[in-house]
A protein has these predicted regions:
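Active-site substrate-binding loop specific to GH73 endo-beta-N-acetylglucosaminidase modules
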Residues: 204, 209-211, 236, 257, ...
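Bacterial N-terminal signal peptides
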Residues: 25-39
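Soluble non-cytosolic domains of exported or imported proteins
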Residues: 60-68, 77-80, 84, 91-95, ...
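N-terminal secretory signal peptides that target proteins for export/translocation
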Residues: 1-20
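Flexible, low-complexity segments enriched for small/polar residues
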Residues: 47-64, 71-85, 103, 111, ...
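N-terminal accessory alpha/beta regions
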Residues: 83-348, 352, 357-362, 366-369, ...
């Protein structure tokens, strides 16, 4: 899968960007203010009478009349309904809602879909994400791994390709340290010249390595490159007495070493190409890399297998490779997986048990396992199991600093006191008691901010979890209980006496918290906000909490209670939620049926909209309420994204809007077809009129015809391999439909669920 750092209109030129802004401004002024801002439509519903019995099943479906019910359910329990989803629920008969929901609660029973097959193919591009954390860190070394290898604390890898990767990053680290030292010693000295200006024949830094990894012998391409350089420098001798042209003029005709190097490398077969790059000397690689043009970068990796592509990205930036693959797989799961409820709940729990991506150098690597092995498998299971798994997760232990927490009266602390008294204290002292995890465990993970605990309870909980740490985190180790750092003695938490029992103290406390009525209400409130409304009816939350307690925290039972409630199906709950940026981006990709071979534009879109994946700094996670996401700037970003997505301005994401079954020729017909496809519940007359107004052909304003308000699709149909078979009329039709689709995807109705 290709990676790109492109922004929204990454394939558009300057005029295209200006047109994007123009049409966005027009539509935002016409459509959005007041339609998405919180108002009566989003206020809390009046709870039903207390004696109103809760239904035992979801509403029955009536052929031809139940699509609004199906769409409401799918809009809440998936990342946006697709025609395939709607047809699947219809096919299940009158009890289709309950049957579909039961299947979603048991993902292993769901038949493999076309989307699942696409997902499997896309995920195969990321073999690194299947590795355990320790192997992932070895294969894609973090900065700490490189520093330890440079300092001789870790051995260099035996694998010749990995050795080359480590050698490059060690050299980069040592160069950076040398520059820093030089700057400190000579603060007024001029900066050293860039390595790019040096000759490719300059002496490389010497790095010892395994004997089986010598520098490769020159390939045939290398010899041809040398011959080309010699030929270029010796051709056309000048007659005596003739003044030669200036060097700059000569270089304009003569190919540079770097250009010849790029051409020779690109001409190699895939495996040899990777080998040649990995064993370049630093200066040569810098020249090669800086001379690559965008088309050549695509050519460089287009026929490599996944392992070869990962080797090259590892050579450039190992941690960035892990982060990009982690973010890409998340979006691909959300877009393509048929296990939609599991993916929605995975997002909810990743946000509930938030871990910040950039906490330290190891966190990106641990997040791979955190999502893969902790959150997704338990997303529909038992809450206590999920709570324990997150508490023991290295990602959480590192993020909230519990891995460094040491009891003040622990064995480790007492030994440190003895060493200090004897004048033998080490350079570092135990960090002491850390209350971060204890506080967030009660406030954010279980009881809630008004859960009835005190600061003294926080301190006692912190003592319970002393010794819960990570075994050599810089090497990717797992959970470890360190008895020497655990605080001895009994603890008293909210009236519960916890006897001294080592690691089991923490398990006992987690059981108490997971089965607390306060936790049941807090989790039920959060789920009701996510699936019903920003201000869910208290009666519904109370019933969900009762189910939570009676089922001992079975998440599936709580969700069923919500599905079977009158409040979930109330008319004022329909379309009452505003999509978060993640929900909006993914639902647009699903609705468009986009073929995604490069997820980076979607990742960039989320960054632009203020919801970067895994990058919420505070432990609270992102808000699920409208007031956090509805603003003029946010709506402009969404409209820009919708237009860019629909008109194929994103590299590696393609949509098709004109089909043989819907050959609409007028804007009105196209709008009708696309509205039924993208927003089956329909749009308002105001929205429809605004869309058609922008889609209508505009007469010339003067002697020279005005350019289109919105440009044609960004992949230039005339340059496609099949351009000869594409008529100008069909191209114009596709452009018109793409523009209309983009306007609908940016409409207020599409931004609701």
């Amino acid at each position: 899968m290709r990676r790109s750092s492109n922004n929204f209109a990454d394939s558009a030129d300057g005029s295209t960007t200006k047109k994007l802004r123009s049409i966005t401004a027009v539509l935002v002024s016409l459509l959005l203010p007041g339609q998405l801002l919180p108002g009566p439509f989003l206020q809390a519903q009046v709870p039903p009478p207390a004696n109103q019995p809760a239904p035992k099943s979801a509403p029955k479906l009536v052929p031809g009349k139940s699509d609004p019910l199906i769409l409401h359910m799918l809009s809440r329990f998936t990342f946006g309904p697709t025609p395939e989803d709607i047809a699947a629920v219809r096919s299940l008969g009158s009890h289709g809602i309950d049957q579909w929901f039961d299947l979603q609660l048991h993902p292993d029973r769901i038949p493999t879909s076309n989307g699942d097959q696409i997902l499997t193919t896309r995920l195969a591009e990321f073999p690194a994400l299947e590795l355990p954390v320790d192997q992932l860190l070895e294969r894609f070394p973090s900065g700490a791994m490189i520093r330890q290898s440079a300092n001789g604390k870790l051995p260099m890898p035996d694998d010749p390709y990995l050795f080359a990767i480590y050698r490059r990053h060690i050299q980069m680290y040592e160069d950076k340290q040398a520059k820093k030292e030089q700057a400190q010693n000579n603060p007024e000295s001029p900066k050293p010249e860039s390595p790019k200006s040096e000759s490719p024949k300059s002496e490389p830094a010497k790095t010892e390595g395994p004997q089986q990894s010598p520098a490769p012998a020159p390939t045939q391409a290398d010899m041809e490159l040398s011959q080309a350089i010699e030929s270029a420098t010796s051709m056309n001798p000048k007659p005596a007495g003739v003044t030669p042209k200036p060097a700059a003029s000569t270089s304009a005709v003569r190919p540079s070493y770097a250009d010849l190097l790029v051409k020779s490398v690109l001409a190699l077969p895939p495996a040899q190409r990777v080998h040649r790059i990995l064993f370049m000397q630093p200066v040569e690689y810098e020249q090669f890399h800086s001379s690559l043009k965008p088309p050549q970068k695509a050519q460089l990796i287009q026929d490599l297998n996944p392992e070869e592509r990962e080797l090259l990205t590892d050579f450039e930036n190992p941690t960035r490779t892990v982060i990009e693959e982690l973010q890409a797989q998340r979006l691909l799961h959300d877009v393509y997986s048929s296990h939609q409820l599991q993916e929605v709940m995975t997002t909810i729990w990743l946000n509930h048990f938030n871990v910040y991506l950039h906490k330290n150098e190891e966190t990106p690597y641990y997040l791979v396992s955190y999502e893969r092995d902790v959150i997704r498998p338990l997303a529909l299971g038992n809450f206590e199991d999920l709570l324990i798994a997150t508490a023991e997760s290295p990602a959480m232990l590192l993020y909230l600093d519990n891995s460094s927490s040491t009891g003040p009266d622990s064995i480790a602390a007492e030994k440190q006191k003895e060493r200090a008294a004897a004048g033998k204290a080490g350079k570092t002292t135990p960090p002491g008691l850390n209350e971060n995890y204890a506080r967030e465990l009660m406030e954010l993970h279980t009881l809630g901010v008004n859960g009835g605990y005190t600061q003294q309870d926080v301190t006692e909980v912190a003592k319970v979890f002393t010794g819960w740490t990570v075994d050599h985190p810089q090497l990717g180790g797992g959970f470890k209980f360190d008895e020497t750092r655990h605080e001895p003695g009994k603890k008293l938490v909210m009236g519960h006496k916890i006897k001294e029992n080592g690691q089991k103290e923490g398990l006992e406390l987690l059981h108490i918290l997971a089965n607390s009525p306060a936790t049941a209400h807090f989790i039920s409130q959060e789920l009701a906000v996510a699936f019903v409304s920003d201000n869910p009816p208290p009666a519904l939350v109370n019933r969900m909490a009762q189910t939570f307690l009676s089922s001992h925290g079975e998440i599936s039972s709580v969700l069923r209670t919500m599905l079977h409630s009158n409040e979930f199906w109330a008319p004022d709950a329909m379309q009452a939620k505003i999509k978060t940026p993640l929900e909006y981006v993914v639902s647009a990709a699903r609705a468009s049926g986009a073929d995604i071979t490069n997820s980076q534009p979607l990742i960039n879109a989320l960054n632009q909209m203020g919801m970067p994946l895994y990058a919420c700094v505070p432990p609270t996670g992102y808000s699920d309420k409208a007031d956090a996401w509805v603003s003029t700037g946010e709506l402009v970003n969404r409209m820009n994204f919708a237009l860019s997505l629909a008109t194929n301005h994103f590299n590696g994401i393609k949509s098709q809007w004109t089909t043989a079954s819907q050959p609409a020729s007028t804007p009105a017909e196209a709008e009708q077809n696309l509205e039924a496809r993208l927003i089956p519940l329909g749009v308002s007359e105001k929205t429809r009129a605004a869309v058609l107004d922008q889609a209508q052909p505009k007469p010339p304003a003067g002697p020279q015809s005005q350019p289109q308000l919105f440009p044609p699709t960004g992949d230039h149909p005339e340059k496609r391999p099949d351009a000869k078979g594409v008529s100008a009329q069909n191209t114009a039709q596709e452009n018109q439909n793409a523009q209309i689709a983009g306007l609908l995807l940016g409409s207020p109705e599409f931004q609701r669920k």
